[in-house]
A protein has these predicted regions:
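N-terminal intrinsically disordered, cationic/polar leader segments
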Residues: 2-119, 123-158
């Protein structure tokens, strides 16, 4: 039996601005920058919960350049829940990630405004669900967010 040594470049990472083989996206850390849950009509409001609350969600994405190819991406979720036309809860979350990027300059903003939020969204959604449940409220699962449409709307001024 003979052994053959085969080499393949299929698994190499793309070479970016640094000229070295590096991952295109590297999430260094994720963190909760700000988290607030208010239940303004507690404890009386708990008697009113007989069905799922009406929930309004506002989502914002932003980023700042740190140094070299490092960026801080923020995903802000503001939620208001109402039951029987009364405020059940107000939840505000700013979930952030520090990332290193090795992408061409023309792809930088879409990666920061679409891909990174898409990667960290499941973690932010988990924080929201846990916060609501630990706050004595019914669990609420946020549907996936279309960050591409959000980005395009922002670019066109909608």
């Amino acid at each position: 039996m003979s052994e053959e040594n085969k080499t393949s470049n299929d698994n190499e990472q793309p070479t970016g601005r640094g000229g070295q083989n590096q991952p295109a996206i590297l999430i260094n850390t994720q963190y909760i920058k700000d988290l607030s849950l208010e239940i303004p009509h507690a404890p009386e409001i708990f008697k009113e919960i007989k069905s799922a609350p009406e929930v309004q969600i506002n989502v914002e994405v932003g980023y700042q350049t740190l140094e070299n190819n490092f960026y801080n991406v923020e995903l802000k979720l503001n939620m208001d829940g109402d039951v029987n036309h009364q405020k059940l809860f107000i939840l505000e979350l700013t979930y952030s990630a520090v990332v290193a990027l090795n992408v061409p300059a023309e792809h930088l903003e879409p990666v920061l405004m679409i891909e990174i939020p898409r990667l960290i969204f499941p973690f932010a959604r988990n924080v929201v669900t846990n916060c609501l449940v630990e706050g004595g409220l019914p669990p609420f699962m946020i549907n996936p967010i279309d960050f591409v449409t959000m980005y395009n709307n922002r670019k066109t001024g909608k």
